[in-house]
A protein has these predicted regions:
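Binding-site signature for planar aromatic cofactors or substrates
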Residues: 1-150
Length: 150
């Protein structure tokens, strides 16, 4: 999960989930992360905040591996750059790109896993269950074959 926090000129904070497929955050250079900002709730609070105050914060959490990373920096909106949007657009992702956000890193920290509940994506659980079911079916077939041989 990825969250982007911003604040307006008066310091009023705002945090918003930023969705996209795995790998949609792209490293541009050692100090810059870029990503396509997809059409969403149409409130444009993040865009308004960044127009007034470029300070921003990324909070990344991986529930499966119980890891989190906090990234401080500044962000800016890039609109109308078709080449940059195409470079950052995840392959085969069908959401509508609205703009690009470029995030310049000033500091980051990886936290300990304490108190992070472990959670799994439904697709990963389905895959593990399918593998288990396949193994059970093979074992049941082997047992049936052994019983017939007695």
């Amino acid at each position: 999960m990825r969250f982007l926090a911003t604040a307006n000129a008066e310091g009023q904070p705002y945090i918003q989930h930023r969705g996209g497929p795995e790998g949609f955050l792209k490293v541009i250079d050692p100090h810059t992360i870029g990503f396509v900002d997809f059409a969403g709730n149409r409130q444009f609070i993040t865009s308004g905040n960044l127009a007034e105050n470029p300070k921003a914060y990324l909070f990344l959490i991986d529930y499966t591996h119980r890891r989190r990373v906090k990234i401080w920096g500044t962000a800016r909106i890039v609109e109308g750059d078709a080449s940059l949007t195409a470079d950052l657009m995840p392959a085969a992702y069908r959401a509508r790109a609205e703009q690009v956000i470029l995030f310049t890193i000033s500091a980051w920290d990886a936290n300990c896993p304490q108190h992070i509940p472990q959670r799994f994506e439904a697709k990963d659980v389905a895959k593990a269950l399918a593998e288990r079911d396949t193994r059970i079916a093979a074992l049941e077939a082997e047992v049936a074959s052994l019983r017939q041989g007695q």
